[in-house]
Amino acid sequence: MRVNITLEHKESGERLYLTQKNKRNTPDKLELKKYSKKLRKHVIFKEVK
């Protein structure tokens, strides 16, 4: 069962990336290191509802 999720950088409040995940394989919240246009560097984006 795949669901769409939004990734947010907590410090800047930036919600830049949309992705999918399989809830059965990854029940925990997803954390990915992605590029932030606002900060111009790679930072950790976390899953939000």
Swiss-Prot record:
Q: Name one GO biological process term.
A: translation
Q: Which residues form a coiled coil?
A: none
- A GO molecular-function annotation: structural constituent of ribosome
Query: Mind telling me which GO cellular component terms the entry cites?
Result: cytoplasm; ribonucleoprotein complex; ribosome
What keywords are annotated for this sequence in UniProt? Answer: Ribonucleoprotein, Ribosomal protein
Q: Which PROSITE patterns match?
A: RIBOSOMAL_L33 (PS00582)
UniProt cross-references to SUPFAM superfamilies, sorted A to Z: Zn-binding ribosomal proteins (SSF57829)
The keyword Ribonucleoprotein is assigned to this record: yes
Q: Name one Pfam family in it.
A: Ribosomal_L33
Q: PANTHER family from the xrefs?
A: 50S RIBOSOMAL PROTEIN L33, CHLOROPLASTIC (PTHR43168), LARGE RIBOSOMAL SUBUNIT PROTEIN BL33C (PTHR43168:SF2)
Give the family this protein belongs to, as stated in its UniProt record: Belongs to the bacterial ribosomal protein bL33 family.
Task: Specify the protein name.
Answer: Large ribosomal subunit protein bL33C
Q: Which organism is it from?
A: Lactococcus lactis subsp. lactis (strain IL1403)
